[in-house]
Amino acid sequence: MTLFIQSDATGAGSGNVDAPEAFVNLVVIANGDTGLGFTDLSPRIQQITYARTLGGAPPVRLDTLVNTFFGVNPQNIDIIIVPVLENFVLADGSRMNRRGITLSPAGSGLPGASLNSTTSCLVVYDTTDRNRLGQCLARAGTGGTRDLPISNPVTLYHELSHASRVVTNALLQVTRECDPASPEENAAITEENDMRTQIATALGVAPELRDPNIHCARKGCRGDGCCIVATVASGSHLSAEVDALRSLRDGYLRRSEAGFAFFGRLHEAYYGFSPEVVRLMAAHAGLRDVVLRRYVRPLVSALQTIEDYTLGGMRGAELTRQLREHGDDSTEAELALLDGDAAATADLSGPERELSATLIAHAGRDPYVRWALIDPLFLHRTARRAAAARLTNEEIGRTLAAAIDGWAAQLPIEDFWPSLTRSEARGELRFLADCLLVTADARRRFGMRLAAAFPDTRAIHAALADEPDFGEEDE
Amino acid sequence: MTDAGLVAHLRSVRELDDALEVVVDVGNDSDRTLHYVAEVRAIDYDPATRRLRLRLSDRGRQLVIEAAMVEPTFRTVEPHSEASLVLSLPRTIVRLAPQAERSPEPRFEEHRIADATEVEVEIGWSRTPYYADVRARAEPPEAWEDGTAHASLTVRPE
C-alpha cells in the first residue's frame, strides 16, 4: 500500500492542505468504486486502500499505484498526494497557482528532485480553483484551440500518470517544449484523456479530449493572440480573417528556424506601427471597414492562395478559381498607394490619408513588413492584369504561380543561418522547399541569394550543394 | 525618438483583510507599445531579513513535470504613457521545509509575507507580444523577454 494523502503539515498548523478534496478526486478516478478507502497512518498522512471491483483504465492505474510496493524508500511511502492551496510556493519561488506538478524523490536526479526535500515522490496540486475554469488547454481535433478546462480529478490523474513512471523508473524525456509536447507530457495527456472519457461516460455526455501534442495552456479561454490590426478591423480575435492569419503563422511557418527568425523580425517591425493604426481606427470609426475591406481581406485572400499553391499543390485554372473564391476586393487605388504613388491619395478623406501615410512610412521601409504583408497584395493586380489581357484561367494560374515563386525567392535572409551546422542548414532548406520554395527556379534564386549573403560560411554552402536545385555544386 | 524599456515604480504595499496588495506603476518612455508580464509568477521571501521579492517573470523557474505549462498573463503599456498594476497576493505563503535528514514525509513552513519590510518587484517585458515558440527546439517563455524592470520599496512597520 504505497499511495498516501498529506492531511496536515507539520510545523505549519492545519489548514494548508485540503485532504478531503484529494480523496474525493480519487473517488472520481476510481469511478465511484466502493472499494476505495483510507486509514490514518499518522496525524499527517492518510494511507489509501483499494480493493478494486470496477474495470477501466483509471481504476486499474489507481489499483496498481495503491497495491504495489515500488521501493522508492525503505518506509514504502512511495507517492504522497499533497493537495495544496493557492498560497503554496515551490522552492524556486514559483507559485502553485492552479498548477499540478510531480516532484521526483530528492536525490533521484529526475525532474523536480531538487525542489523536493523528501525521499517520496510528491504529487502537488492546487485544489482551490474548482474545475480550473480559468485554465484553458488545447482541445483535440481543433488545431490547437485552447478552450478546454481541466478539473481537479483530471489534474490529479494526469500527475499520477507521471508519478507511476517516476516510481517505476520509466520516465520519458521531459523538456520545456510546448508544441509539440515532450514525450513524457504526451504520454500523460494521452492517459489524462482516459480520465476525461470516464467522467464523460459517467455523465452521459460526449468526451472533450485534450490534444496530446500541445502541453501549454493559457488563462482565460480566448484565442491565441494575433494580428492586432486584423483583430480590431474585423471586430474579433476569433474572426475568420484573424483565424486564417494565425493558422498561417503558427500552423507551419513559425515551426522552422527560418520561419521563427523571420516572424521575430516581422513582429518587431509590425508591433512598432500597428498600435498607431489601431489608434487611428479607434479615432475614426469608418476606418475599420476601410482597413478590413481594402487591406486585411485582400491580404488573407492572397496568403491563402499562396498556401493553396505552395502547400496545397494547386496549379493552373484551379489556382485562379481559388483566388477568386477567397475573394478579391482590393482596388488599384490601394495598391498604388502602397506602391508609394502620392497621386493616389488625392481622393482620400483626411483619416484615410493619415492611415495611408502610416502604412507607407512603415510598410515601404521595412523589408519584413513589405515581403509578408504588402507584396502578397500585388497578387491581385497580377490576376487582374492577366484577366484584362484575356488570358485563360489556366494561363492566369501559371502567371500567378510565377509571381508567387518570384515572391517566395525574395524571402528576407536572416542572420541565424551561419549558426547552423551543415545538417541543420540542410533541414531548413528542405523545410523551405516543402512549404515555400516549391519550384526549382524559386529554390535556385533563393539559394543564390543565401550563398551571396554568407560567402564565407562553409556549412551553408555545403548544405546548398547537398540539396537539389539550390544552385551550388558539391565541394 | 527614444528606445527605452519598461520602467517600474513600486507605489504602495498594504495589508488588506484577505490579501497583501502591491501597486506598481509601469512607464513607457519609448515610441512603441511595450508588453509585460502582469502576474506574480514567483515569490521569494527571506524571513530572517524580511525581504520579499516578487517576480513577474519565469526566469529562474526550474523544469518540473506538470499538468500544463500555463503561460503568464500579459499586458501592454502605450508609448509615452503609464499604467498601474495592482497585485493581490496571499498574506502568507507555505512551502516545503528543508530537511537536514531526509524523510519520506513532507514538512511545511509558513511565512507571513505581509510582514516584509523590503519589497522588490521584477517585471519581464518585451517590445513584441508573446507568442508561444512552436519550433522543435523551443525556448522557454522567458526567452521572449527583452529586459527586466526593477522596483523596490522599504515598508515601514505599522
Predicted region positions:
Chain B
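Generic beta-strand hydrophobic packing signal
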Residues: R11-V13, E39, I43, R50-L52, ...
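Surface-exposed edge beta-strand/loop patches
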Residues: T73-E158
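Surface-exposed loops/turns
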Residues: L16-D17, P79
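The feature marks short-to-medium sequence segments in extracytoplasmic or secretory-pathway proteins
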Residues: T33-E82
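Asparagine-centered strand-capping/turn motif at beta-strand->loop junctions
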Residues: V24-T33
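Structural beta-strand segments of beta-rich domains
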Residues: D18-V22
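N-terminal edge beta-strand
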Residues: M1-R14
